[in-house]
Amino acid sequence: MNPSRCRIIAIGKVRKSWVQDGIELYRKRLPGLTIVELRDSNPEKEAESIRQTLRRDEWPVMLMEQGETLTSINFSERLRSLGSQRLAFVIGGADGLTAELKALAHWKLSLSPMTFPHELARLLLIEQLFRAQAILQGSPYHRA
């Protein structure tokens, strides 16, 4: 997994300092990973903003409650299987993603059957990206 081939596109700003601290901790460990924050609004405006931000060479990975739930090891294996494909992990706002955006997904991913605030979902995702990299590199960070 190459962090420079991944972006996180998220609606809204992180307002809680402890969440921002966690995100920054993992960002430093994943050099090259980009996080794009888009203004929160209504779902249609958010969807348009996300569509405009997605690049043609990226596969959108939509984070959603109805997405595929994976173990950390399975997540790392999936990332490895995608090779050098550019990925854009998309985290919607409070009202989630529109049906139109969900239809654009190359992969629908759920972090859990539970619902999380988008700020916390961002922290969980970046930690799982770091964990996936650690698993693929054989690092002791992941202890199953």
UniProtKB/Swiss-Prot annotation:
Disulfide bonds: none annotated. Keywords: Cytoplasm, Methyltransferase, rRNA processing, S-adenosyl-L-methionine, Transferase. It is found in: Cytoplasm. GO terms for cellular component: cytoplasm. GO terms for molecular function: rRNA (pseudouridine-N3-)-methyltransferase activity. Its main location: cytoplasm. It comes from the Bacteria. InterPro entries: Alpha/beta_knot_MTases, RlmH-like, tRNA_m1G_MTases_N. Its EC number is 2.1.1.177. S-adenosyl-L-methionine binds at residues 92, 111-116. It catalyses: pseudouridine(1915) in 23S rRNA + S-adenosyl-L-methionine = N(3)-methylpseudouridine(1915) in 23S rRNA + S-adenosyl-L-homocysteine + H(+). Belongs to the RNA methyltransferase RlmH family. Homodimer. Specifically methylates the pseudouridine at position 1915 (m3Psi1915) in 23S rRNA. This is Ribosomal RNA large subunit methyltransferase H. It comes from Synechococcus sp. (strain CC9311).
